[in-house]
Amino acid sequence: MKNKSALLLLALLFTVTASAVDSKLFVDNWLFTLTDSTKMSLHDYNDSSWRKLTLPHDWSIEGDFLATNPSGASGGALPGGIGWYRKHFDINDYAKNKRYYIDFDGVYMNSTVYVNGVELGTRPYGYSSFRYDITQYVKKNGNVVAVRVDNSDQPNSRWYSGCGIYRNVYLVETENIHVAHWGSFVTASQNGDMNIDISIDNKTNSKDKITVRNSIVDFHGRVVAVSSSVSLANGNAI
């Protein structure tokens, strides 16, 4: 059982040609205000008076414990409300032939995300991670991401949830052909047989031939390599 467990972990050491993923922690130099205005989503909005902070952040725990707070006892008797986060950023190694994403591990709750004034979408609730493709909206310099967080409808939880971007955020850069988000899945049977499923996403305008290489290394240094080539149409995933 011990050998099988180690083998399973080592099976994750796979590489995919032209699929490099550069995921950078994106938590420093955010700005925050516990107020609300639709203008706060605009690229050129004046946020110079906002509070500067590092994520993760929970504005609720910074408030006062009051019996009159609508969150009630289950919410810690702490305030909710609506808050905004903004971050100015550059992409120093920006390239037009790359893909760019922003990943949120968790925002509580009802978050709406904007990049350079463009609304990307709204994520209800607050416990799931989510991603937006920002490739067509970003440039090398002078980018702004804005996040509206609405936890004003109280009470909404059976326990203390907090408010805000309470988990990490990542800026992700990939090739146009890359392993899909959450695109690797490894399973093993009782007798030690292993199955590795890899999803590949093609964002190019052409049909490409790709090679997926999976390597399994045992305790004796023996390597078993399996390679397969497939054609992948543009805009598709396998």
Provide a role label for each language-model segment:
Residues 8-15:
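Bacterial N-terminal signal peptides
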Residues 186-192:
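Short, solvent-exposed loop/linker segments at the N-terminal edge
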Residues 71-77, 185:
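Short, P/G- and charge-enriched loop/turn segments at secondary-structure junctions
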Residues 115, 193-232, 237-238:
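Beta-strand-rich binding/interaction modules
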Residues 20-71, 144-148, 152:
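Accessory carbohydrate-binding/adhesion or oligomerization-edge regions at the termini
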Residues 1-7:
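Bacterial N-terminal signal peptides that target proteins for export
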Residues 35, 52, 132, 233-238:
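Short, surface-exposed linear segments at secondary-structure transitions and domain or protein termini
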Residues 24-26, 32-36, 80-185, 203-204, ...:
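Accessory beta-strand-rich segments of carbohydrate-active enzymes
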